[in-house]
Each structure stands twice: as C-alpha cells, then as structure tokens.
Amino acid sequence: MTEVLVLLDKFNFRISCCESITVGLFAQEITSIAGASKYFSGGFITYTNESKINIVKIKKTTIEKYGVISKQCAIEMALNTQKILKTNIAISFTGNAGPNALENKPVGLVF
C-alpha cells in the first residue's frame, strides 16, 4: 500500500473507494499509513443494492441487467465515487463472498 501512496504523491493525485465485498478493508488499509489523509479523500461502503442505488447513484437498470457482481456495476461504482468525491482515481470492489453462488456467479471479486 505504501507504493500506492508514493505514486499518488508523485502525481499529486487523490484516491477514493467504493467497497461492497471488502466492507471497508481498502479504506482501513490505506488509512493505516501515516499521512494517508493527504491522498485519500474517503469512500463508501455499499453492501446492499439499496445503498449502491441511493448513496453512489448506481442505476437500478445496471443492477437489473448485469447484477451487482459485474464489470458494469464495478465501473459505475468507481466512476460515480470519483465524481461524488472529486478525486483523480476511484477504485471499487464488488463480488461474491460465498459460501454459495450469487447471481449464478462463483465466489470471487470483481474490481
């Protein structure tokens, strides 16, 4: 994670996140490093479909058509977070933590 902060510093960038499957782990990890507030603007934990729609403004049609465990949803999560928090970079995490398949998709992550 320190390498990420070095790169953010080099380009004078700020980062944000939108987390579902990781439930705040990325934000916790990046903010555990001293000085992270210079680079990290904040993030959203959107564990439910409702929070994705209401907080990060994911289109309901995206969820209905592709599901929350999809590249399309992950991209929309990142782009909307970037716009809301006005950062250079936003990262999103969605996926299926298991133990069973969700949306007919295996356990795993989509970034």
Model-derived features with residue positions:
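Short alpha-helical segments enriched in small residues
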Residues: 1-111
